[in-house]
């Protein structure tokens, strides 16, 4: 095991593919901590770590980064982001990945429990809501210390599409997407706005039509699939990486950001013992609060359909 001179927080990234490599790079850019990049492909992890390290004199960022295939190197990590798993190919749904990726998550969870039981764990592997529950069950970590990255990404996609349609800065748009990370996610139109002006009011002002909003909702639901079909040999990684790092930053620096994430519900929204996308506050204690919104009858119906789909998917893990 290689010794590290820990200058700050220790962050372990399990999986050094496109998302894992990009997360490692973003962590260095933002100086969030020292990075252990772990992958069963030892050469890939070490190669990407070295490449990122060699960029540090240009980017003027400090801290350690190294690649490994040894789980002992994640010992006492403060935070862990899991991206390992097979990715979608054209024609595949996220759900097609279940059996293979559950076995991968099981091995990872066992090693996290052994070497870093106090870490805050962010799961990115798809199908997200299934994998984060598998992580919880096999690692036995407290539920407040495990979350899934989904809603941040879905909300970002929705915000981007709205911004492009209205020809406004993406910085002006706030949006919120709940439910499962898939075709039955729930973009909450009434909680989405442009510089404080609700989407409903923008429709009344004639700046966007209801049909166009509906079209954007559907495109958001198919956002990952759209990128998979274009890339043909992989799935999205820039936006997922940014999303995971935003969550990580909120935890490490106790920012207490309210973010839509897949969190363990114990009766909130009428759901028990499942990870579902809802607004949460992430701080130094992990998931510090689950924000329970009052949904309309229509919203609740879509949300419950999303929950039912997740329940079916997790039945055999």
Curated annotation (Swiss-Prot):
Q: Which residues does NAD(+) bind?
A: 15-20, 39, 101, 124-126
What is the name attached to this protein's record? Malate dehydrogenase
Identify the Pfam families for this entry: Ldh_1_C, Ldh_1_N
Role, per record:
Catalyzes the reversible oxidation of malate to oxaloacetate.
By its UniProt entry, which InterPro entries does this protein fall under?
Answer: L-lactate/malate_DH (IPR001557), Lactate/malate_DH_C (IPR022383), Lactate/malate_DH_N (IPR001236), Lactate_DH/Glyco_Ohase_4_C (IPR015955), Malate_DH_type3 (IPR011275), NAD(P)-bd_dom_sf (IPR036291)
The alphabetical list of record keywords is: NAD, Oxidoreductase, Tricarboxylic acid cycle
Gene from which this protein is expressed: mdh
Q: Which terms does the UniProt entry file under GO BP?
A: lactate metabolic process; tricarboxylic acid cycle
**Annotated organism of origin:** Ehrlichia ruminantium (strain Gardel)
Report the sequence similarity comment from the record: Belongs to the LDH/MDH superfamily. MDH type 3 family.
């Amino acid at each position: 095991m290689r010794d590290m001179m820990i200058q700050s927080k220790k962050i372990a990234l399990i999986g050094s593919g496109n998302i894992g490599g990009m997360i490692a790079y973003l962590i260095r850019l933002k100086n969030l901590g020292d990075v252990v990049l772990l992958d069963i492909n030892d050469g890939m992890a070490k190669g990407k770590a070295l490449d990122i390290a060699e960029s540090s004199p240009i980017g003027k960022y400090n801290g350690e980064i190294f690649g490994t295939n040894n789980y002992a190197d994640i010992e006492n990590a403060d935070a862990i982001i899991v991206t390992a798993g097979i990715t979608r190919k054209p024609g595949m749904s996220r759900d097609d990945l279940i059996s293979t990726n559950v076995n991968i998550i099981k091995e990872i969870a066992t090693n996290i429990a052994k070497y870093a039981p106090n870490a805050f764990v962010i799961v990115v592997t798809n199908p997200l809501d299934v994998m984060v529950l598998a992580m919880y069950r096999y690692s036995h970590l407290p539920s407040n210390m495990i979350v899934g990255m989904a809603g941040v990404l879905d909300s970002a996609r929705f915000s981007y599409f709205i911004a492009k349609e209205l020809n406004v800065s993406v910085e002006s748009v706030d949006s919120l997407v709940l439910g499962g990370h898939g075709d039955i996610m729930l973009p909450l139109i009434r909680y989405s706005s442009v510089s404080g002006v609700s989407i409903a009011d923008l429709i009344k002002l004639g700046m966007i039509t209801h049909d166009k909003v509906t079209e954007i909702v559907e495109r958001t639901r198919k956002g990952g699939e759209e990128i998979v079909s274009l890339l043909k040999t992989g799935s999205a990684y820039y936006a997922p990486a940014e999303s995971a790092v935003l969550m990580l930053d909120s935890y490490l620096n106790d920012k207490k950001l309210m973010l839509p994430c897949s969190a363990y519900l114990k009766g909130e929204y009428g759901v028990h013992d499942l990870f579902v996308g809802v607004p949460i506050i992430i701080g130094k204690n992990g998931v510090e609060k689950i924000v329970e919104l009052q949904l309309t009858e229509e919203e609740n119906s879509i949300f419950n359909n999303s929950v039912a789909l997740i329940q079916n998917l997790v039945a055999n893990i």
